[in-house]
Amino acid sequence: MFTPHNIPSNETSPTSRSLIEQLTRRHFFGRTAAGIGTAALAALLGREGLAAPIAASGKGILEGTHFPAKAKRVIYLFMSGGPSQLDLFDHKPGLADKRGTELPASIRMGQRITGMTSGQKTLPVAPSIFNFKQHGQSGSWVSDLLPHTASITDDIAICRSLNTEAINHDPATTFLQTGSQQPGRPSLGAWLSYGLGRANDNLPAFIVMISQGSGNKTDQPIFSRLWGSGFIPTEHQGVRFRSGDDPVLYLSNPPGIDGAVRRRMLDKVGQLNEIAKESFGDPEIDTRIAQYEMAYRMQTSVPDLTDLSKETKETIDMYGINDSGVDGGFARNCLLARRMAERGVRFIQLMHRGWDQHGGLPGQIRGQCKDVDQPSAALVKDLKARGLLEDTLVIWGGEFGRTVYSQGALTENNYGRDHHGRCYSMWMAGGGSKPGITFGETDDFGYNVVKDSVPVHDWNATILRLLGIDHTKLTFRFQGRDFRLTDVEGEVKQGLIA
């Protein structure tokens, strides 16, 4: 926190010294009737009367999009852990006759596999035990595990040819979200906030919500850097909303502090920050001021956003929020995502854990699909009914796929699957994506891409293109180099664009 004691006396102007004399620590905390513990800067938020002028414009760095934008916002349904494409979207009926046989060397082609299966004596082929059917006018193949998703196949583009360089969770997730396997780069949502700015001055441009699935309860952790801003200004990092009645930490007034007092506190801190900016020229001070003011406004906007009492029973039922067996956290988050989209939030990230199914996959994936199938489909249907799907891009998928061979013992009704980055499936809907298609093909074993490969950088380049952004031109100069989400690669996949 900036205090008057940070400023050398020989560097302050008369005006600054006058203000500093007024704002001694005793005077500041005495007037606000709060001790350090109850009035920490993390809690310098408030709402009574009108908010002060916004410290930052909220505009993005781009004066306008490079292309006509088809999408204005993104809802990213991230399935953490790596869903099995072979049990959900990549139908391989020919594998039934190969059950238990060794994965051919001609298919593996010497590719590395994780240490969890590299020591197995055999790599037995494990065909899915679940049935697939074709759905909609598109005739897209979808597993019986996803009956609700099957009902929206004419609205989604299923991509079966994604591939990634990483085979472990953290680097793969970091790569998908930031364009680099190494931590420290800005996330996709942060790039969009930086480039396009926010559309609502009372809510962040980038919001994150996390839920735990009923599948693998010991799934990999989700680190906050996955929605971080890296080296771009911190005002562009995501804001996590927790479940429950208090979604944002320190948003409510602490005991003994009303909105008027909070407003005065914030004004004084703003003055101190202005002095610091004048003295040191640190651009992050503007970010700090903007974040305090945004938090102040959120005291009213967030309770209104998260109040579902005005939603109809039909809407609540459509998402399955109160249904037994449907994860209320994810279902509720999907409905909140629609409400955020209505209010202009630029990037909405839902992260649902539990897909890391190395063993006991058939049992775990049933529950996991029940968690997300109905709410995901309901979100697409709800957006479409309200006229929002046209300019809202919805994305569903994880950081990689799963192997065709079984991890551990293969039995009649049980198997596990290891990590597999050579090919996996995701889908997108709305926002100018091409509906009712299946894009890309894999070989007969679902092990390698054989047509229309979509590396992660291409996927992200395509997302940016739908938002009207040339991925090669949204850059940030850091340590003498112009960085971008797609690094030095990336090719827009026109086949995914309507």
Residue ranges and their predicted role:
Residues F2-A498:
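Ligand-binding pockets and gating/stacking loops
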